Regions:
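Structured, non-catalytic alpha/beta "coupling" segments that mediate domain-domain communication
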Residues: 1-18
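Catalytic center-proximal scaffold of phosphoryl-transfer enzymes
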Residues: 15-371
C-alpha cells in the first residue's frame, strides 16, 4: 500500500464473529477495500495536481517518496475528489444543519466566465465557458500593502443556470438581507453578466439598494481596443472622460470618431458600440461618487488568475468533468478546504446516513416482496 511516507507491504488478520468480518488494521489506517493507495496519499496527490500537470506530479512523488506512480494514479485522485464533492453536496442538502445567517451592511457579488479548451466540445467550438461567481462582504487591510476579501465564497459551474441557482441559494442560506443591506455588483457586462442579471438577483433577495458597476478595467480595455485605429489622442480623451465620469466629453470623442468613418459597415459597428457604452454609462460612475469605497470592487480578474494559471497554460485541453472538478479543487486548496473535504467529520456522518438509507431501502424492497 502506498502511504504519504512511501510504499509498505504488510500482512494483517481478519476478525469475525460469525456474522460480520472486519479488518481492524485497515480501519485504523483508514484504508478502503481493494485500494492500494491510502486516503492521505491521495490527498497529497490531489493537492499537487492543483499546482502542476499530472506528469509533473508523478515526478515530484518519485523524487520525494521514491515511489513510482503514473498519471492514471493522479487521475484516480482527481476522480476521488469529484466523488467527494458530490457526496458533500448531498450531505449538505440532507443532513447539515443550516448555518446561522449573518447580517451584513454590504454584500459584494461579481461574475464572469472563463473560456477553457475542451476535448468534449464540438469541432467548430473547442472552448467551454466556466461560470465563475465571487461573493464577499468587503476588503480588510491585513498588512501594509495587502488587503484580503472577507467571507469570500466562490461558485464555479459549467452550467450557467446551476451557477446562478447556487449563487442565490448560498446568499439566502448564509446572509440576512434587510432594508439596510447594500448589494454591490460588478461585471464586464458580457453575455450572462449584464446589469439585468444582477438586478434580478437583487429583486430575488429583496434588497432596497443595489449598486451595479461596469468593471472599469474592461471599459478602458474596450475603448482602447476600439479606438486604436484612430488618433491616439482620442483614446486618451476617452480614458479621461471615463475617469472623471464625463459623458459629454465621451460623446465628443464619439462624434469625432464618427466624422472619421467612411465605410458603411464600420459605421454600423461603431453605432452599436457607441449605443452600448452610452446606454450603460451610468454603471461607470465611480464608487466615491456613490458614497462607497472602491475597495473590494473589481476583484474578478485576480480571482480568475488561479484558475487560468493552472488550466490554460501550454494549450491544455480538459474533459467536461475535468474542468469542473479541477476548478473546484483549486478553489478549495486556496481556501485551505481540500483537507477538510478528505478528512472532515462530515464523511463519517454521511457514511452512517448512507448505510442507514441503504438498509432502509433493502427493508422496503423486502416488505414489497412479502406483500
Amino acid at each position: 500500500v502506498v502511504f504519504s511516507f512511501g510504499e509498505i507491504t504488510f500482512s494483517r488478520s481478519r476478525w469475525t464473529n460469525g456474522f460480520e468480518t472486519r479488518i481492524p488494521v485497515d480501519e485504523w489506517l483508514g484504508l478502503e477495500k481493494y485500494k492500494r493507495y491510502s486516503i492521505e496519499f491521495l490527498y497529497h496527490v490531489a493537492k499537487l495536481a492543483t499546482m502542476m500537470p499530472y506528469r509533473q506530479v508523478c515526478k515530484v512523488i518519485d523524487s520525494t517518496l521514491q515511489t513510482i506512480i503514473t498519471k492514471d494514479c493522479v487521475l484516480k485522485a482527481v476522480k476521488f475528489v469529484e466523488k467527494l464533492l458530490k457526496e458533500k453536496e448531498r450531505y449538505r442538502f440532507y443532513l447539515e444543519e443550516p448555518p446561522e445567517r449573518k447580517k451584513v451592511k454590504k454584500l459584494y457579488v461579481e461574475g464572469d466566465g472563463v473560456m477553457i479548451k475542451s476535448t468534449d466540445s464540438r469541432e467548430e467550438r473547442r472552448y467551454l465557458d466556466l461560470t465563475h461567481f465571487v461573493i464577499h462582504t468587503g476588503s480588510k487591510k491585513v498588512s501594509t500593502k495587502r488587503y484580503e476579501l472577507q467571507d469570500k465564497h466562490e461558485i464555479l459551474q459549467l452550467n450557467y443556470d446551476k451557477a446562478k441557482y447556487n449563487l442565490l441559494d448560498y446568499i439566502y442560506n448564509n446572509y440576512e438581507v434587510d432594508d439596510d443591506t447594500i448589494l454591490i455588483t460588478n461585471s464586464d457586462m458580457g453575455k450572462g453578466y449584464t446589469s439585468r442579471v444582477f438586478k434580478e438577483l437583487g429583486k430575488a433577495l429583496k434588497v432596497k439598494k443595489h449598486e451595479h458597476f461596469w468593471d472599469i478595467y474592461h471599459v478602458k480595455e474596450k475603448l482602447s481596443s476600439y479606438l486604436r485605429k484612430y488618433p491616439i489622442e482620442l483614446t486618451d480623451f476617452a480614458s479621461d472622460a471615463v475617469k472623471k465620469y464625463n459623458s459629454d466629453k465621451l460623446e465628443l470623442v464619439f462624434d469625432t470618431v464618427e466624422s472619421l468613418i467612411c465605410d458603411e459597415l464600420e459605421d454600423q459597428e461603431f453605432q452599436k458600440f457607441k449605443k452600448k457604452v452610452l446606454n450603460n454609462f451610468k454603471y461607470i460612475k465611480p464608487a466615491h461618487l456613490r458614497n462607497l469605497s472602491n475597495r473590494g470592487i473589481g476583484i474578478m480578474e485576480s480571482q480568475h488568475r488561479k484558475i487560468t494559471y493552472r488550466m490554460k497554460r501550454r494549450g491544455m485541453y480538459w474533459s467536461k468533468w475535468g474542468i469542473s472538478t479541477m476548478a473546484n479543487m483549486i478553489i478549495l486548496e486556496r481556501a485551505n478546504g481540500l483537507r477538510e473535504l478528505f478528512f472532515g467529520s462530515w464523511r463519517k456522518v454521511y457514511s452512517e446516513y448512507k448505510e442507514g438509507s441503504f438498509s432502509a431501502g433493502r427493508l422496503f424492497k423486502k416488505t414489497d416482496e412479502l406483500d
